[in-house]
Amino acid sequence: NIDNAQRQLSGLLGASETLIRLTASTGVQSADTPFIEAVQTAAGKISALFESALARGDISESDLFDRTYAPVPNTDPPQHMTRFTAFTDRVLPAVQEPLLQLDPRVVFCAAVDTNGYLPTHNLKFSQPQGSDPVWNAANSRNRRLFTDRTGLGAARNTEAFLLQTYRRDMGNGTFAMMKDVSAPIYVKGRHWGGFRMGYKVAG
């Protein structure tokens, strides 16, 4: 049945992701290596940015780890605010935006917390919502909770990196085969979330 097929597919995906991680951890270079190294570097930069902000008193640790998602009224798909959203809007674009130029296949790169909440997306995906939810889904992807398998996998992974393959809903009924590579973000030893990069599968 469908449930069994989905479980088997999920198991197969998990096994392939483990194999990819083990291969990369041995130092073998692959087509994915530049993307893996880029997200690991970015995750480290974000960790340092967050820790520096805490040290300066720009944000409190309780606010940075806020997990209360206040719905933004009249948004479809639903958007949410936290006590750290305004802070990440100030500091994350400087890390995220340049990485869009890493390779023509890169579609997005953004930090998510451990629940898949994406506060600050790339500028091109952070348009104000309009009246069309289909357009919003494609163009207003900031302040959203991404709780699908890929989103939560990236958010909760604590290994050095996680490489996943999935079909991304691009809006307007179109999908694209994508790879999602992520690396965990730690703040003073606490797992804050992960840094994700999505790029198109070659061919």
What are these language model-derived features?
Residues 4-203:
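N-terminal membrane-sensor/transducer module of prokaryotic signaling receptors
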